Amino acid sequence: MAELIIVYFSSKSNNTHRFVQKLGLPAQRIPVDNRPLEVSTHYLLIVPTYAAGGSDAKGAVPKQVIRFLNNPNNRKHCKGVISSGNTNFGDTFALAGPIISQKLQVPLLHQFELLGTATDVKKVQAIFARLKHHTHDKQKQTNNLITERTHPCHKPMRHTSH
């Protein structure tokens, strides 16, 4: 199978961290401090939303996530985004997901509230499995194309009668 991991950001409250732990999937956390993180494999991004609510979308995407995604290598490996939020904030609920989805041109795969429910966990696990399988199939097709290009095709031998 092609490698796929979860990359996520969680503040010191650890709400997103606890959700990711429930998934039981390979994961890498974007540091809260300014330490850089570079990934070299495909990933799903799980990100909380930090918006004030109403029409105030400023600051919806955490600065650490912006810094992480400013790295072109990190951007190219993102296969989709999942966001969390608080429905008390109305229109800005889980807004970080749609913002990142639009900027990176990747699918918004799921949105959940706060720590997520057991149903959210199952949905994200299913999304991960489906995407991992899809990524594996695409990698297999790419490998076949590469194999076809790098290995010359031998012409069949002609049989001649004596």
From Swiss-Prot:
Coiled coil: none annotated. One of its GO terms (biological process) is protein modification process. One of its GO terms (molecular function) is FMN binding. Pfam families: Flavodoxin_NdrI. It comes from the Bacteria. PANTHER family: PROTEIN NRDI (PTHR37297:SF1). Probably involved in ribonucleotide reductase function. Belongs to the NrdI family. This is Protein NrdI. The gene is nrdI.
